[in-house]
A protein has these predicted regions:
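Cleavable N-terminal export/targeting peptides
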Residues: 1-42
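Detector for outer-membrane/organellar transmembrane beta-barrel domains
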Residues: 165-245, 253-254
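Extracellular/periplasm-exposed beta-strand and loop segments of Gram-negative cell-envelope proteins
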Residues: 109, 118-120, 153-168, 205-207, ...
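Outer-membrane beta-barrel proteins
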Residues: 108-113, 154-158, 201-205, 246-248, ...
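Transmembrane beta-barrel architecture of outer-membrane proteins
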Residues: 83-85, 103-105, 123-125, 171, ...
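Transmembrane beta-barrel domains of Gram-negative outer membranes and organellar outer membranes
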Residues: 31-157, 172-173, 178-184, 230-232, ...
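Predominantly the C-terminal beta-signal and adjacent terminal strand-loop region
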Residues: 250-296
Length: 296
């Protein structure tokens, strides 16, 4: 999975899937009540608020100080040889702390017959916590900066162990910063995100953690940007760098290019083109990403 995707932003990162784009509505936009529409973000494939393939600094829901908020989501990624389905939910309190959960199912498709595999899918459970450290997406002089931890457990470790993975569960951390720049793109507002992840997950953990080539964590770059055309529509992209821990196959960086629709504070839909590159020896795994989220 050579990092040929590095140039594309984390294998399509599910085409900025994550609706990260939405999470950054212009401060000039009027909110229904409290926080602005879309500032709760979309849901990443690992459960936390942000873009499709990476977390951003915003938290799930539309809660303010002393309030609860959250969301539930379903995501489907259709690739030439695989499919990925994710369901999950996140709860936040006081726009300060977020707790999330995601269940991933990765159908192996043509890889099953190619290698006569004993299983036709891989599943993973992810439990996350994210804390807003300081700053604000819009109103503070400093960008909003958050830090998070994710505990991941791969539920079907036979195949990962056969290809060289060292463990079926692990903890990884990340720090991420997001900022909205008003009128920065021909008068349209722009949201920019940058982050670092400390991880040894193979294909985000679906192929276990660590490997015969490398069994230590790596510092990995993540980032994204979105243009907000109005309070309800955004387009953007995400990028996610990934490690190369397994000798049996390379691992591509991911990128995505997305369109996000946020009709109100309770519903969001993200459609993206995900460029995921090589996955488990099969190249050109680029396809469509669709995510639907309900928020409160």
């Amino acid at each position: 999975m050579a990092r040929n995707l590095s140039t594309c932003l984390s294998p399509v990162v599910l085409a900025s899937v994550v609706g990260a784009c939405a999470a950054w509505v212009a401060p000039a936009v009027q909110a229904e009540q409290g926080r602005l529409i879309a500032t709760g973000g979309a849901s990443s494939i690992e459960g936390g608020a942000g873009g499709g393939i990476i977390p951003w600094a915003m938290l799930a829901g539309y809660d303010e100080q002393g309030e609860w908020g959250g969301n539930a989501f379903a995501t489907h990624v259709d690739l030439p040889d695989y499919t990925l389905d994710v369901v999950g939910a996140a709860v936040s309190y006081g726009n300060r702390v977020e707790v999330s959960y995601a269940h991933q199912r990765f159908d192996l498709g043509s890889l099953v017959s190619k290698f006569n595999l004993p299983e036709d899918n891989l599943t993973q459970d992810i439990f996350g916590v994210k804390v807003r450290l300081f700053g604000d997406l819009i109103y503070d002089q400093l960008p909003q900066v958050s830090a998070g931890l994710e505990y991941k457990h791969q539920n079907d470790f036979l195949i990962p162990s056969l290809v060289g993975a060292k463990r079926d569960s692990d903890v990884e951390g990340y720090v991420t910063a997001s900022r909205l720049f008003m009128g920065a793109a021909f008068g349209y507002n722009v949201v920019v995100n940058a982050g670092l992840r400390y991880s040894r997950a193979n294909e985000t953990g679906l192929l276990g953690f660590g490997g015969d080539r490398r069994d230590t964590r790596s510092v990995l770059k993540e980032g994204g940007a979105a243009i907000l055309f109005n309070p309800h529509w955004a387009v953007g992209m995400d990028y996610r760098e990934k490690p190369d821990n397994l000798s049996f196959a390379g691992e591509s960086d991911w990128a995505d290019f997305f369109v996000g629709w946020f009709p109100n504070k309770h519903v969001s839909v993200v459609l993206a083109y995900a460029r995921l590159g090589e996955i488990a020896t099969l190249d050109n795994q680029n396809g469509t990403y669709l995510s639907v989220q309900g928020s409160f």
